[in-house]
A protein has these predicted regions:
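Non-catalytic structural scaffold of enzyme domains
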Residues: 1-257
């Protein structure tokens, strides 16, 4: 592999980033690290996340990564600026300036619990949009993320649609009629088709779009290979993760650690 870019998070979410980068830079070599041993990021404390991310970055640099994509909104917002070797890493963030540029007026930022409840997210919103911060609301989307990790969004479409519909209804009951949603967990684009069906008038923002543009200067011409590494624990095994990938018709060249 020629100067591979590593892409990682705790599981399925980061594969959407692998696909987005591969589509734009087809000759880029990629190391895809699904850190199931640390799943779920969204339920960790900030200190736990910092330790996990630092260890993962060190591991991927040892594996030969020339640059690293932290493909998870929660640690990007809460801990990325606090870790060593942060100059070798780019994170993924809610694209709030894009929302403002499109003149949207009532936006829901949805993502993992640890990010949604963090002061770091509120600081980020204020930095990005200033006085417009009052038109941005936040909501814990952990129940939706679980639908993806379990594979239920494929195996049980009726229940998935019901869960998402209830989630949207609850959000609009709290914050009024929405005109935009940022899918601020890399898992959530897997269920964007459900959102489009239920609320077709609401614009969805995928943070991956900005990330793909941002890494352009770090890409290289290689062979277009993807090497996958899957960590596992007793609770979250590689075997179960591979079953979900199989349902999604994703085939990997992988090693298990």
């Amino acid at each position: 592999m020629n100067k591979p870019i590593a892409i990682f998070d705790a599981g399925l979410g980061s594969y959407t980033i692998v696909e987005a980068i591969k589509k734009t830079y087809p000759q880029q070599d990629i190391i895809y690290f699904a850190d199931r041993k640390s799943f779920p990021y969204g339920a960790k404390t900030i200190e736990e996340l910092k330790t996990i991310i630092e260890k993962s970055v060190d591991f991927l640099l040892e594996k030969g990564a020339s640059f690293i994509v932290l493909a998870s909104n929660a640690p990007s917002i809460t801990v990325l600026d606090k870790i060593k070797n942060k100059n070798k890493v780019i994170g993924i963030y809610p694209p709030l300036k894009n929302v403002l540029n499109d003149r949207r007026k009532n936006t829901l930022i949805i993502g993992a619990k640890v990010m949604i409840e963090s002061s770091e997210l509120q600081d980020y919103i204020k930095r990005e949009v200033g006085d417009y911060c009052k038109q941005f609301h936040v909501e814990n989307a952990s129940p939706l993320i679980q639908l993806i990790e379990s594979g239920d969004f494929i195996n049980n479409t009726e229940e998935t649609e019901k869960t998402i519909r209830n989630f949207i209804d609850n959000g609009e009951n709290k914050f009024g009629k929405l005109d935009s949603i940022t899918l601020s967990s890399t898992h959530l684009p897997w269920i964007s088709s459900y959102f489009k069906k239920i609320i077709p008038e609401v614009k969805l923002y995928d943070p991956a779009d900005n990330l793909v543009k941002a890494i352009k200067n770090y890409t290289n011409i290689g062979e277009g290979k993807i090497h996958s590494i899957i960590s596992e624990s007793e609770k979250y095994t590689a075997k179960e993760f591979l079953k979900i990938l199989d349902i999604l018709k994703i085939k990997l060249d992988y090693e298990i650690i």
